[in-house]
Amino acid sequence: MNYSIIIYIIGMILEIEAVFMALPAITALIYQETSGVTFLITIALCLVIGLPLTRKKPTRKAFYTKEGFVTVALSWIVLSIIGAIPFVISRSIPNPVDALFETVSGFTTTGASILSDVEALPHCMLMWRSFTHWIGGMGVLVFILSLLPLTGGYHMNLMKAESPGPSVSKLAPKVQSTAKILYSIYFVMTVIQILLLLVGGMPLFDSICTAFGTAGTGGFGIKNDSMASYSTYLQVVITVFMILFGVNFNAYFFIITKKFAQAFKMEEVRYYFGIIGIAILIITCNIYHIFGNAAKAFQQAAFQVGSIITTTGYATTDFNTWPEISRTILVLLMFIGACAGSTGGGIKVSRILILCKTVRKELHIFLHPNAIKKIKMDGKAIPHEVVRSTNIFFIVYVLIFASSILLIAFDDFDLTTNFTAVAATFNNIGPGLELVGPTGNFGMFSWFSKLILTFDMLAGRLEIFPLLILFVRDTWKKF
């Protein structure tokens, strides 16, 4: 284990977090809020700890998969703990467990909250909550990749550990260039959404916070009714961008570089839009009688389908009161999730495709024992290692999911609440059904259950294995 490089990167994470906290500090200055002092205190703490850790350059720059997983897991834990400090010091969220839950929910782009009155928070705290979504959406480690002193292709080990999906592709010969391309697309799309929201009459502060939540597919709203009080135009803009941010960013790169054939050839993206279209159609028909207007029913169905499948978690209505078939479809979409290589969570459309194709392959082999059949995607054979890791991911996913439901059941809430609470946190959605529906929150859970759900949020965002590897004894051996 190369401890020196891990410590160095964690130091950089703290320094970057100090820079990020300047935004809510400036927000506090603009709105003349005294709670902004808490960000200055936390910035000082980040620098006091971070600067000494980065003063000495790593003597050994070799950085392999094991170091990548450990660095990513520890970085996200440190990022979340430090990020929770302003909430605690300002007394906005005085309970440390609640503050950690809220912060992890932000960075992991989950959007599950323990707050019953969001509007009571100062502007600077609301800005920080939303900004954590934007930071966590693309990944803070991807953001600093170009700053790391790694050579020999070691960047890819770090990027693979943090990026969502069964595999990671380079968009450019150098990983640093890939990171810059991804963040450039991310930034430009965020700015475009802010401008479109401003055109629709949304205040600047609301536009920035909403765009941060949409871009990171997070879902922290700054209103108690989430997005319900905004106009139809604004809700449509948010719907479109939620769906766009759930697309594999490789597709945007192909479009920008005029490789249109490659973009439209992406099987995962085609299925992603197909699933969205079918879900919207069924739910629109199912809820038509509630709204009495086909256009309104379609708009509400599109918003909630886009919100859930991309794991954003915004709401324009209490879908918890919708007919059972609509609620069931939304729960199923929680598990499917967005595309790999997007800012969305869930199992990912690509993994669902690989699992389905694996089942089809096995059925074919049962019928034709001597046949040799390869699993393909986008016309290319999927490496056996990717298929194997996808199968293992699914098995571990089910085990953690079941264990989490069992552990939080000690709080004695109903099964639907417990099931969807785990689904909403593990898949980084935000709202579930019943007590954790769009009009509820997670505040009623015990501190123990909140820690379980916090673990689920981190495990879901980091794709399970980087977090689990911390508990394996062999991980910490020096050689």
Task: For each feature predicted by the language model, list its residue ranges.
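Membrane-proximal intracellular helices of multi-pass ion channels
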Residues: M1-F479
